[in-house]
């Protein structure tokens, strides 16, 4: 098994910590909030308010299940438009009250079903991209598993984007890439090598800002490392003038 194939396998492993695991272990007094106030509450996106040390923050994540029943309830971590609208509602609330936003991302992509399209999946993702680019509080996004397509990017227009060591971040799945390029989804590993989807490759290209080393899926070291980096980075981001913060975020994505 090549290194890329191993990382792809580990990124998708059902045993990985979920967004709710990180929310409960890194933050204090996490309180989950529900619903987009327009259509429904999407279980594939979770979010709420919490404390990071003594700092109030908004935490949002894409939640995969740990077993079949849980995955069905979470739609296998593939958000509907109401999930993205819930996330945006929480981000705008964070902006109103001056709370930094931290997102945890693990998705193969946004749900492509007919109902999702009819309810405006593309519009929901596009609006998140637009609103996050100008959100007037610090944003940090962390890839904790798969970072697939616009479904991941809709929570990743951030001042800092981090990845765990054995995760992936790509414009589409390697299987989708192989199917489009070669009409053969079985060549996914070959596609992944061409796509440059690993944390090390993306860090080298400047797409992400930090790699979090992994020592097993459930590691107190990972949790403490993320918590420490979050405290330090949010302190630095909050110290910047708002105009500088927003300009740097804009320029960060313009260079792609």
Swiss-Prot record:
InterPro entries: Acetyl_CoA_COase_a_su, ClpP/crotonase-like_dom_sf, COA_CT_C. SUPFAM superfamilies: ClpP/crotonase (SSF52096). The keyword Amino-acid biosynthesis does not apply. PROSITE patterns: COA_CT_CTER (PS50989). One of its GO terms (molecular function) is acetyl-CoA carboxylase activity. GO terms for biological process: fatty acid biosynthetic process; malonyl-CoA biosynthetic process. Its EC number is 2.1.3.15. PANTHER family: ACETYL-COENZYME A CARBOXYLASE CARBOXYL TRANSFERASE SUBUNIT ALPHA, ACETYL-COENZYME A CARBOXYLASE CARBOXYL TRANSFERASE SUBUNIT ALPHA, CHLOROPLASTIC. Belongs to the AccA family. This is Acetyl-coenzyme A carboxylase carboxyl transferase subunit alpha.
């Amino acid at each position: 098994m090549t290194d890329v194939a191993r990382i792809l396998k580990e990124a998708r492993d059902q045993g990985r910590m979920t967004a709710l695991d990180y929310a409960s272990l890194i933050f204090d007094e996490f309180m989950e909030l529900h619903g987009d106030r327009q259509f429904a509450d999407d279980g594939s996106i979770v979010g709420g308010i919490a404390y990071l040390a003594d700092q109030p923050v908004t935490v949002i994540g894409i939640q995969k299940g740990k077993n079949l029943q849980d995955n069905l309830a979470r739609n296998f971590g593939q958000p509907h438009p109401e999930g993205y609208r819930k996330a945006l509602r929480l981000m705008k609330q964070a902006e109103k009250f001056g709370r930094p936003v931290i997102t945890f991302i693990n998705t193969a992509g946004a749900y492509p079903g007919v109902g999702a399209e009819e309810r405006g999946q593309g519009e929901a993702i596009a609006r998140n991209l637009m609103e996050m680019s100008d959100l007037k509080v610090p944003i940090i996004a962390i890839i904790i598993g798969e970072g697939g397509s616009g479904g991941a990017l809709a929570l990743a227009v951030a001042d800092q984007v981090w990845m765990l060591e054995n995760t992936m971040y790509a414009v589409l799945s390697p299987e989708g890439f192989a199917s489009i390029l070669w009409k053969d989804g079985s060549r996914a590993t070959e596609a992944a090598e061409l796509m440059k989807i690993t944390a090390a490759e993306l860090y080298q290209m400047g797409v992400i800002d930090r790699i979090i080393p992994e020592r097993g899926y459930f590691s107190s070291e990972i949790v403490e490392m993320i918590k420490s980096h979050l405290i330090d980075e949010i302190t630095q981001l909050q110290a910047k003038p708002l105009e500088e913060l927003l300009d740097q975020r804009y320029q960060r994505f313009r260079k792609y």
